[in-house]
Amino acid sequence: MRFLDIRDTNFDAEFAAILARGEETGREVEQVVLDIIADVRARGDEALLEYTRRFDRLEADSVAALQVTEDEIEYAFAKVKDEEIAALKLAVERVARFHEKQKQETWLSTTEPDILLGQMVTPLERVGIYVPGGKASYPSSVIMNAVPARVAGVGEIVMVAPTPGGEINPHVLVAARLSGVDRIFRMGGAQAVAALAYGTATVPRVDKITGPGNIYVATAKKLVFGQVGIDMIAGPSEILVINDGSGTPAHIAADLLSQAEHDELASSILITTDRGFGEQVATEVERQLAQLSRETIARTSWETYGAVIVAGSLDEAIAFSNRIAPEHLELAVANPFEILPRIKNAGAIFLGHFTPEAAGDYLAGPNHTLPTGGTARFFSPLSVDDFVKKSSIVYFSAAGLNRLGRDIVSIAEMEGLEAHGRSVSIRLK
């Protein structure tokens, strides 16, 4: 863990190591992923089975045998506690309610005589959602990807999840059923992304792939983009907490560790105007680390990519936050609503001392699939918009074309596109 002062002349150099996390590994895996994609594209189910045996240690006679059955889903419901099912149902309901507000309708404008202009909103026909299965089980990822797709009106939702040993976590299966997933395959990695992108004899080709995964999954999504749509290239998770010396150090420490336990590349940063408060938080992190079941992962993350930064003012802290555009931003200050309008770049913003980032991870309502690695400067959280496409609608009557046609021809002539102009002038009276 680094204890830094933003006013030090060498601050940028010291902080650069945190910003660069994972860059070198991304370059190393690209050729491996390219080969896997090409193989699945060429050999389909056969290649998919081979990679599933090799990477997931899962034996199957056919890809069809990798599809989860109705009996398996019913068995999952029997294994999950009633209170856990109730919590997942509540999460689905709240996430659906939030995303309903994002829906856009087809519209037509008739403000001009003889001309209709508008936009048609159409759900995607089929999407694939990737649910990670590595160092933890993530039913919340199912909900956050499948529910907005269902709210958008997507025709079919196909889910893939890596399952070393062959059994998908029952909480994940329950979440999939509650969220409206149609088909589930026990497969993961770059090979699953390739199968969704190009289709095989058994796995249907989708229009878009969403959901987080490891570096191989992220690279595969990047490489199949264009063949299919993708949501974003998600990197390691991150949290930035802005603090003014108010609040409880133990709370801030717990929030920092909630990200550190994700994986070793996760980054947890506190920037505070109160050095003493920062020191208390650092001490509290060490105390809480020893109590975590995932201590090894969290400690590696905290010691390598964690930081406590002292700022001279909230102005400095806000400017720093806008510069790095964090995935999760907590405003753990006395008056969070006062500084909220000054936040320009963040995936999700959590206000006040009683809004831990974990509330947004699970059932507050907004999506937890967020831009990472500074991409919140230009990317947004996953939403209903990711599962629809929009078509422009244009209608001119003869009178409408006669009214605007000469100007259309004039612009076509400016560009030297004679046939464009003629396609209009030939219709003019």
Swiss-Prot record:
One of its GO terms (biological process) is L-histidine biosynthetic process. It is an enzyme of class 1 (oxidoreductase). GO terms for molecular function: histidinol dehydrogenase activity; NAD binding; zinc ion binding. Keywords: Amino-acid biosynthesis, Histidine biosynthesis, Metal-binding, NAD, Oxidoreductase, Zinc. The active site is at residues 327-328. NAD(+) binds at residues 130, 191, 214. Pathway: Amino-acid biosynthesis; L-histidine biosynthesis; L-histidine from 5-phospho-alpha-D-ribose 1-diphosphate: step 9/9. Binds 1 zinc ion per subunit. Zn(2+) binds at residues 259, 262, 361, 420. CDD domains: Histidinol_dh. Its cofactor is Zn(2+). Its EC number is 1.1.1.23. The keyword Oxidoreductase applies. It catalyses: L-histidinol + 2 NAD(+) + H2O = L-histidine + 2 NADH + 3 H(+). Substrate binds at residues 237, 259, 262, 328, 361, 415, 420. One of its GO terms (cellular component) is cytoplasm. Belongs to the histidinol dehydrogenase family. Catalyzes the sequential NAD-dependent oxidations of L-histidinol to L-histidinaldehyde and then to L-histidine. This is Histidinol dehydrogenase. The lineage of its organism: Bacteria, Pseudomonadati, Thermodesulfobacteriota, Desulfuromonadia, Geobacterales.
